[in-house]
């Protein structure tokens, strides 16, 4: 009977260690799994387990590699790792030493993003010809975003500063996570169905690709494409571009920029009105000058073509003919006596024609003067009428006539239904503002 050779635990462990570390298949291993038992050691090293439904393996990542990660690992994260298998001799346990780790799923999201982008581009959803124009003077702006956070506050502040005449309608939604996609689609449909909004602002703050993913969903892209109301998107930061940004009618880099793109600047409008008044005055003066020059030119042409000028020419011809006739009379007095008498009767009495020509000249002169006066009066009236209309649009001139602007919480009050007893209101006059409190209200039945 042969005597058995017994190995020490150390020898067996060393043998297994050599086998593991010399196996080419284990020198570079690619694993995917879920992080559990995560510890971020004070030294900077990471210790955790990678598990799936049926097994788990210990894992570690030295500080040198951990410092290059683009995210902060935590328990529950699904990751893709690259590393090698090693054995801890003192405990006889093996583990994976990791030198590369990324979140699982981002690669799939980017792939899906590109597939959807190409599909919608081929369908023509991103064509510039389909972009609806943004109205210059919106009365109602529908804002689809979270009812909390900085986005809605930035939009409200910007619109209140630039264009108080616009009414803001907030439609709160879930901007990420489960149910957010359906919430966005339903809200877009609701605004198109129920609201009288002139433009929609669809926005949310920044975040990772997973946070913004609802705005890359095909259903959301289709809902924006089908909107009858123009849509301005302000999603994420300036460097983030979602499929919703591609299909929207206008993309803004920030919520503040979206509010600016949706509204005119009141100060710019007032300046534009003043500039147009000055331009209208200039063109009116130029037209009056042109019409005056035209009338003077016509007057000169009429004078040159007048009967008086023709008579002067005929007189010269008569004088010339008389000289010829005198000479002819001396040579052939007997033969042409009757003819000379007849010509004398016709040529020596032009008074009646001259009188008729004078009357025609006076009539034409009167008509020209009347036409000139009518043209000048008409252009002056049109100019004054345009000036009054433009001045009537100036809010300051409206206030100078006794009108005022009433607001509650920076919103313009246009109806008694917008206020209640004990509300505090701000009233702006031409030379200042007053804060008042509503003691009672009485509606006017129309």
Swiss-Prot record:
<keyword id="KW-0540">Nuclease</keyword>
<dbReference type="Pfam" id="PF13742">
    <property type="entry name" value="tRNA_anti_2"/>
</dbReference>
<comment type="subunit">
    <text>Heterooligomer composed of large and small subunits.</text>
</comment>
<dbReference type="InterPro" id="IPR003753">
    <property type="entry name" value="Exonuc_VII_L"/>
</dbReference>
<comment type="similarity">
    <text>Belongs to the XseA family.</text>
</comment>
<dbReference type="GO" id="GO:0008855">
    <property type="term" value="F:exodeoxyribonuclease VII activity"/>
</dbReference>
<keyword id="KW-0963">Cytoplasm</keyword>
<dbReference type="InterPro" id="IPR025824">
    <property type="entry name" value="OB-fold_nuc-bd_dom"/>
</dbReference>
<keyword id="KW-0269">Exonuclease</keyword>
<comment type="function">
    <text>Bidirectionally degrades single-stranded DNA into large acid-insoluble oligonucleotides, which are then degraded further into small acid-soluble oligonucleotides.</text>
</comment>
<dbReference type="GO" id="GO:0003676">
    <property type="term" value="F:nucleic acid binding"/>
</dbReference>
<dbReference type="GO" id="GO:0005737">
    <property type="term" value="C:cytoplasm"/>
</dbReference>
<dbReference type="GO" id="GO:0006308">
    <property type="term" value="P:DNA catabolic process"/>
</dbReference>
<dbReference type="Pfam" id="PF02601">
    <property type="entry name" value="Exonuc_VII_L"/>
</dbReference>
<dbReference type="InterPro" id="IPR020579">
    <property type="entry name" value="Exonuc_VII_lsu_C"/>
</dbReference>
<dbReference type="GO" id="GO:0009318">
    <property type="term" value="C:exodeoxyribonuclease VII complex"/>
</dbReference>
<protein>
    <recommendedName>
        <fullName>Exodeoxyribonuclease 7 large subunit</fullName>
        <ecNumber>3.1.11.6</ecNumber>
    </recommendedName>
</protein>
<keyword id="KW-0378">Hydrolase</keyword>
């Amino acid at each position: 009977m042969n005597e058995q050779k017994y190995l020490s635990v150390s020898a067996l462990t060393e043998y297994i260690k050599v086998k593991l570390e010399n196996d080419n298949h284990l020198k570079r291993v690619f694993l995917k799994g879920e992080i559990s038992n995560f510890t971020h050691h004070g030294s900077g090293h990471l210790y955790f387990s990678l598990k799936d439904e049926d097994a788990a393996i210990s894992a570690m990542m030295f500080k040198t590699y951990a410092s290059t990660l683009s995210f902060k690992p935590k328990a529950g994260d699904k990751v893709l790792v690259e590393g090698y298998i090693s054995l801890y001799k003192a405990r006889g346990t093996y583990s994976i030493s990791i030198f590369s780790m990324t979140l699982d799923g981002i690669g799939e999201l980017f792939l899906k993003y590109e597939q959807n982008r190409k599909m919608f581009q081929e369908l023509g959803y991103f064509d510039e010809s389909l972009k609806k124009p943004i109205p210059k003077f919106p009365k109602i702006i529908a804002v689809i975003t979270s009812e909390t956070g900085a986005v809605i506050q930035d939009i409200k502040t910007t619109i209140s500063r630039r264009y108080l005449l616009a009414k803001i309608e907030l439609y709160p939604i879930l901007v990420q996570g489960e149910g957010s996609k359906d919430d966005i689609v339903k809200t877009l449909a609701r605004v198109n169905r129920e609201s009288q909004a002139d433009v929609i602002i669809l926005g949310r703050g920044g975040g990772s690709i997973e946070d913004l993913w609802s705005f890359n969903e095909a259903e959301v892209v289709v809902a924006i494409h089908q909107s009858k109301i123009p849509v301005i998107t302000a999603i994420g930061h300036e460097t983030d571009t979602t499929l919703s940004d591609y299909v929207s009618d206008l993309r803004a880099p920030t919520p503040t920029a979206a509010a600016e793109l949706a509204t005119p600047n009141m100060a710019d409008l007032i300046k534009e009105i003043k500039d147009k008044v000055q331009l209208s005055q200039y063109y009116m003066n130029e037209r009056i000058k042109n019409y005056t020059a035209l009338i003077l030119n016509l007057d000169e042409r009429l004078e040159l073509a007048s009967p008086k000028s023709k008579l002067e020419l005929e007189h010269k011809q008569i004088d010339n003919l008389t000289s010829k006739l005198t000479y002819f009379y001396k040579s052939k007095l007997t033969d042409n006596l009757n003819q000379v008498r007849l010509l004398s009767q016709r040529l020596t009495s032009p008074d009646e024609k001259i009188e008729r020509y004078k009357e025609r000249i006076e009539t034409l002169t009167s008509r020209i003067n009347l036409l000139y006066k009518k043209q000048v009066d008409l252009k002056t009236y049109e100019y004054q009428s345009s000036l009054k209309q433009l001045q009537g649009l100036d809010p300051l001139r409206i206030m100078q006539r006794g009108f005022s602007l009433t607001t509650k919480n920076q919103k313009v009050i246009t109806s008694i239904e917008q206020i209640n007893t004990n509300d505090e209101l701000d009233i702006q006059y031409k030379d200042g503002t007053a804060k008042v409190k509503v003691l009672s209200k009485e509606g006017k039945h129309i």
